[in-house]
Amino acid sequence: MLGRITTHALSARRLRRAHTGAMLVAVGALAAASTIFLGGCETPEKVTREVDPDVQIPPGEHGLRKLSREEYPDLAAAYKARDDKFAKAIDISAQWFMTGTSRQNYSSEQMGPISQVVAGHDQAAASVYAFRELAAKSSDAKAFQDAVYEQFDIWQTRGKDGKGKSLITGYCSPELKASMTATEIFKYPLYRRPADLVTDSVTGEPLGRRAADGSIVPWPSRKELLASNQLAGSELIWLSSAFEVYVCEVNGSAKLIMPDNTVKYVGYAGKTGRPYIGLGVSLKDSGVITTRERNLSSIRRLYERDSALVQQYIDKNENMVFFGMYDGKSWPAGSLGVPVTDHASVATDKKIFPRGLVMMFDTKVADYAGRQNQFNQFMMDQDTGGAIRAAGRADIYMGVGAAAEILAGNQFADGTFYYFVLKPEFMAKYPLPTSAKTTPANIVRGTPAAAPNAKGASAPAAANLTQVPAPPLAQPPASTPAPAPAPK
């Protein structure tokens, strides 16, 4: 369950190619990731934001438009850029489509306007299985593209302008120092999921708090909840500042280093469902910081200079996030309840985009120095987030720790993205495993879902998939720092 911190989407292979010998994995916790631009670095390409990327789709509509054959994008560059991370991510989606959670999410009760794009679970599952087979078995890029053009409908995001233009950001999982007990240094807790938090049994969306008389009532705001002392006794783990607590809440997951150097993993376990207001946005809109300062390093330095000022803007966010302990194998998990893969998993608004499908991005991504590079790559829609709530937004998962944070902090570019949906007449060509088919025997109704995911959206129950270790990120040079990402 991941939150909102930004990173770029080069695969490890392409990253190494783009920065041969120059990048070294950044070490240390998020707290140590304060970075600045050096004088010799190129200025990142400016993004023109004449249209609000968070413009909302009208109720009852999805976020895609079906392309005519003449509008289909070229697939050659993305086909050639496939790597082991994409292979891992598409395998995870294929496995997810064999679970009861996927059938619940693609049930007629849950799909809403997405049913206008994908008829149901079996078509969505077949889309992933077919794409995986074609990517693996096609003799070359032309053969692959010809097959996809024939067998798939391609849908493009409506974007922020109705024509596909979108803001492409990124996020990652922070690494912080923490303690299992309160100390003079560690005195700011993350909280466990309260017993009286009520969520939808299928979607995991919060419904409210169970009152003593059995009724369901709204939760108070985050500020009111903390001031009321209602959560006393449900502390899970302790951090060194209120700002780091907020960073964890926004991201929904973290790798925590204990005083004895052992490692704990925390992940999203629920939220109150109150309105989410991003800290970076609040500070910028109020004129406290500039657009360029809307990154984690700058906001952290501001907090260190004037914690009371930053706390005022933290308090504008009414939503409260709760946490649970995770093992390293299942962490970090996205809104599908399965592990996300750095440089291959994407977060989108699941109310208007379909879960688990193959996507293709046409955008620019930033390197460690903030330079923009053309980027065309297949990825998997496997997550969502509190700040990613529009057709004009997508967030690429960049991994864990300071190296990912640097890339995330630099990723802020216009672009577009596409979804691939297998045409119904080709479904028989790609038979699903029995366990992946929608039948009365394998539809599980009413199974409690995991609470909404880290970033604030609903996370279904985990599918118990083992995360295969991904290749390490190429490391950024110590002499080429860049802003770390900001909570959006």
Task: Give names to the regions the model predicted.
Residues 42-48:
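Bacterial lipoprotein signal-peptidase II cleavage site
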Residues 1-18:
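N-terminal secretory signal peptides that target proteins for export/translocation
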Residues 42, 328-477, 483-488:
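C-terminal soluble interaction/assembly domains
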Residues 3-5, 99, 362-367:
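Short regulatory "switch" loops immediately downstream of catalytic or recognition motifs
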Residues 55-327, 331-338, 488:
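Secretory/export targeting leaders with adjacent low-complexity proregions
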Residues 17, 22-30:
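Small-residue packing motifs within transmembrane alpha-helices
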Residues 37-40:
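C-terminal motif of bacterial Sec signal peptides marking the signal peptidase cleavage site
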